[in-house]
Amino acid sequence: METNNFNDDLNTNTVQSYEDACQLLGIKPTYPKFVQCAKIDRPSMIAYHKLIIIIRALNLLPNSKPWIPDFNKLYESKYRIWWNIIDNKLSFALTANTPSSAYAPFGSRLLFRSRPLAEYCAKQFKDLWQDYLIINQE
């Protein structure tokens, strides 16, 4: 089974906001309003936009190349965040090693190359995850 021995401290120390992630990736932060989407869906769309940028930055390899999950490598570890949702609030439960298969229930853009990165993202960006996963009907 493959494991990665990368030091994830650089990424977690560098990426503490959406803007930090954009800077690390060398892209300009954008703030789309998703006006073409139903108003109730906009917070989720904005959060997803930010999360994929943040996760891409967190998953950068030490050589600054992007990590892209390879579903052809059966034993490549991939991690996802598991949430408990109670009273419309998120509670971080754990990260799970996602086995490679043709079935990707959580979406490959939201996977992590290591458990520490997944745990960091869950804690640091909990509000974004909540906006992405929960419909706020207020």
Segments (PLM) and residue ranges:
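Alpha-helix boundary/N-cap detector
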Residues: 13-16, 42-52, 113-116, 120
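Acidic, glycine-rich loop-and-strand cores that form catalytic or ligand-binding grooves
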Residues: 31-75
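Short, compact, well-ordered microdomains
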Residues: 97-138
